[in-house]
Amino acid sequence: MSTSYSFLLAGRELDVFLSFSGKIALDVDFGYDLSRNGIKAFKSESWKESSFKPIDLRTLEALTESKVAVVMTSDEEVSSVGFLEELIVIIEFQEKRSLTVIPVFLTKHPLDVEKVSQIFPERAKIWRTAIAKLDNIAAQYSFSRNLAVMHGTHRIKQIADDIRLMFLSSASSDFKGLAGMDRHMKALYALLALESDEKVRTIGIWGSSGVGKTTLARYTYAEISVKFQAHVFLENVENMKEMLLPSENFEGEDLRSVNHEMNEMAEAKQKHRKVLLIADGVNNIEQGKWIAENANWFAPGSRVILITQEKSLLVQSGVNHVYEVGSLRYDEALQLFSRFAFKQPYPSPDFERLSVRAVQLAGFLPVTIRLFGSFLTGRDKEEWEATLLKLNAKQGKDIKEVWKIMEALEDKDIVEASQR
């Protein structure tokens, strides 16, 4: 496969890609234990596909955005061509070191692809090769086999916790070295006042799209979550009010029956625990006000962080401690760009003028700078000039439009990965 994935990987927004061999594997509830730990997961539905076709673009994009792929298989006879084709791409990503693969087998038995191989004999060899490679990868993980032997909930939680530790252990290297992070963290720590347990404190983080609000919040979560008895990172608070009901509704009730993402918070509220709650994507005053007003459900010393694009929303919600994540400074932006374009702190002398131009076109926004730098790395001056000229004509576009432009400039199609 000749495709280059580097510029796509720079724009990652997901953490974990969940792949399933079939419905039995899908029934294992993995997403809850990941999401409550602030790990954003994508559940693939490729297992539903029984006919031969390339992986759909959304699934392929999710795979390129993810750092980890969890492949869950059962002893059922594999009839899903979609799962097998997806597995081929997952293994290729793993071999290129752009993805960590964690196999989870629900039984000791190997996958059986005999019948589906009879229907598509030309694919049989490559499917069996991918399965063999998955077995080899499994040898690295003690929890890959015998999942069904132990209590399902316990084992799933153990695996989710292992993945969480994997992300926390790499948080410093992923985030701390980013340009401007130390400056942001110093200011945010002052607002958090973690040394004080006198009361619940609500903090607001705001800034324009792509400026790095979520990156800052995720790093903060990784750094301080261990200080709290309960913690959760909510990616979407659209239905939070319905999810976290008044405490009397939980008395004598099995908390697992309530929306999974909020179980931890509901239990913490009931037991008056010290909580860290980070709510991303707060987009209206009702949401902000409701979260801020009800923060006192939790024990003194709890911290609630709201993330939004609108400062006025925070003010009107009664949030007194507010931090703006502004665009990167000139030197920070150039340093970040150089890290992705040249794998060093500063631009190569021959490319300094072009690097400054690229940073300006990126609007000093971290997510766009990472995309530009990753796309341009290894290219000659002529290619830089042509790329920047096309991007200059598209100034003012949002990040999704920029992504499409970058894809259009790439002369190889990433869908080749699913057709080998």
Curated annotation (Swiss-Prot):
Function: Confers resistance to low temperatures by limiting chloroplast damage and cell death, thus maintaining growth homeostasis. Regulates steryl-esters and sterols accumulation. Limits leaf necrosis associated with virulent bacterial infection (e.g. Pseudomonas syringae pv. tomato DC3000).
Summary of the tissues where the protein is detected: Mostly expressed in leaves and flowers (mainly in sepals), and, at a lower intensity, in stems. Present at low levels in roots and seeds.
Disrupted-gene phenotype: RNAi lines display chilling sensitivity. Massive necrotic response to virulent Pseudomonas syringae pv. tomato infection, but normal bacterial proliferation.
Record SUPFAM superfamilies: P-loop containing nucleoside triphosphate hydrolases (SSF52540), Toll/Interleukin receptor TIR domain (SSF52200)
E.C. number(s) listed in UniProt: 3.2.2.6
Lineage of origin: Eukaryota, Viridiplantae, Streptophyta, Embryophyta, Tracheophyta
Any Pfam family: TIR
The species this protein was found in: Arabidopsis thaliana
UniProt domain TIR: residue ranges: 12-167
Record bears the keyword Isomerase: no
Keyword Nucleus in record: yes
Domain NB-ARC: 185-406
Catalytic residues of the enzyme: E86
Reaction(s) the record says it catalyses: NAD(+) + H2O = ADP-D-ribose + nicotinamide + H(+)
One BP annotation, GO: defense response
Identification of the protein by name: Disease resistance protein CHS1
Domain of life the protein comes from: Eukaryota
